[in-house]
Amino acid sequence: MIERIWSGKSWCYLLLLPFSWLYGAISLFRRFAYKQGWLSSWKSPVPVVVVGNLTAGGNGKTPVVIWLVEQLKAQGFKPAVVSRGYGGKSDQYPLLLSPETQPAVAGDEPVLIYHRTGVPVAVAPSRSDAVKALLAQYDLDIIITDDGLQHYALQRDYEIVVIDGQRRFGNGWWLPAGPMRERAHRLDSVNAVIVNGGDCQANEIAMSLEGEIAVNLKTGEKKAITELGNAVAMAGIGHPPRFFNSLQDKGVKLIATKAFNDHSEYTLQELQILTPHQEPLIMTEKDAVKCQHFAQNNWWYLPVSAVLEDLSVLNQVSQLVTTRKKLVYDLKQ
């Protein structure tokens, strides 16, 4: 129902407009207050790059974070990642992830990023605290924040907004009448706009999510996704239909799909009933990190990687880090 309202296909959004005006007024005031210095913000000694979005729901931020981290590592830089850790509940913050950290503690996306990239990852409600914890523990030269575009308490040097190219901004209204955390004109002040699928507009960078090889959660076996035969797909992400459609576009024959809420916690029983005849069950890599400890032989996940048509973002971020490092070096002389 909420997707229908946000897409502009229902007039029910009119009932929610008073709440949206309030949300928008608070959002605008907070950003203005930070710009004027009425609310304090903290500046990191190393560059901070924010990968965020203007809308609620999944847009492809995490694959962009992983892509950027991997590219920076390949160039010899030392990146780390901070996150709010949505869906996780830790006894203490900031929390530095380790190989044993579970999604229930740190959140599914931070755990996924940690295992995919191997770089230091920290989570905390205050991203500034997470950055400070990382800098106290590691020698770093850049921080990437997964989400956090609206977390103005942490100053940033470069802003990347990721847009779902198919849904874009829906009806354009602030939450809850629409999907917007901030209005579309906010794009005028960011450094880069990446569009995940769909058509790009002027000055936007096209991105696709590529992945053809499924991995078995239980055994680690790898197999072409099309070789799994008739399968069931499940997803607990911001926009599950995108995942289901991508599987069908790759030629996967889906006999059923099951959408869960984003950041859902799963049980063995509720997933087993999805495949009563032991059909292959395909899930996202984000879901897989939460199901690994009770995985079954017929469970598979599909890793995907972001592919950008334009590498200007990487070049600009690399130059940012290089310039900051040179400045620090010169000041020490």
Curated annotation (Swiss-Prot):
GO terms for biological process: lipid A biosynthetic process; lipopolysaccharide core region biosynthetic process. Keywords: ATP-binding, Kinase, Lipid A biosynthesis, Lipid biosynthesis, Lipid metabolism, Nucleotide-binding, Transferase. InterPro entries: LpxK (IPR003758), P-loop_NTPase (IPR027417). It catalyses: a lipid A disaccharide + ATP = a lipid IVA + ADP + H(+). SUPFAM superfamilies: P-loop containing nucleoside triphosphate hydrolases. Its EC number is 2.7.1.130. Pathway: Glycolipid biosynthesis; lipid IV(A) biosynthesis; lipid IV(A) from (3R)-3-hydroxytetradecanoyl-[acyl-carrier-protein] and UDP-N-acetyl-alpha-D-glucosamine: step 6/6. Pfam families: LpxK. GO terms for cellular component: plasma membrane. The keyword Flavoprotein does not apply. ATP binds at T55, A56, G57, G58, N59, G60, K61, T62. GO terms for molecular function: ATP binding; tetraacyldisaccharide 4'-kinase activity. Transfers the gamma-phosphate of ATP to the 4'-position of a tetraacyldisaccharide 1-phosphate intermediate (termed DS-1-P) to form tetraacyldisaccharide 1,4'-bis-phosphate (lipid IVA). Belongs to the LpxK family. This is Tetraacyldisaccharide 4'-kinase.
